[in-house]
């Protein structure tokens, strides 16, 4: 999952919402 208010790392190690 991703939080539009913060930078979160996925289980794959990818960074979303840079």
UniProtKB/Swiss-Prot annotation:
List the catalysed reactions: L-citrulline + L-aspartate + ATP = 2-(N(omega)-L-arginino)succinate + AMP + diphosphate + H(+)
List GO BP terms, alphabetically. Answer: L-arginine biosynthetic process
Pathway of action:
Amino-acid biosynthesis; L-arginine biosynthesis; L-arginine from L-ornithine and carbamoyl phosphate: step 2/3
TM stretches of this protein: none
Q: What is its EC number?
A: 6.3.4.5
Subcellular location(s): the record lists: Plastid, Chloroplast
Q: Where mainly found? A: plastid
Q: Which cysteines are joined by disulfide bonds?
A: none
Sorted alphabetically, the Gene Ontology cellular component annotations on this record are: chloroplast
Provide a Gene Ontology MF annotation, just one. argininosuccinate synthase activity
**Membrane recorded as keyword:** no
What the record says about family reads: Belongs to the argininosuccinate synthase family. Type 1 subfamily.
- Put simply, this protein is called Argininosuccinate synthase, chloroplastic
What organism, scientifically named, is this protein from?
A: Pseudotsuga menziesii
């Amino acid at each position: 999952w991703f939080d539009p208010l913060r930078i979160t790392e996925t289980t794959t190690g990818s960074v979303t919402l840079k």
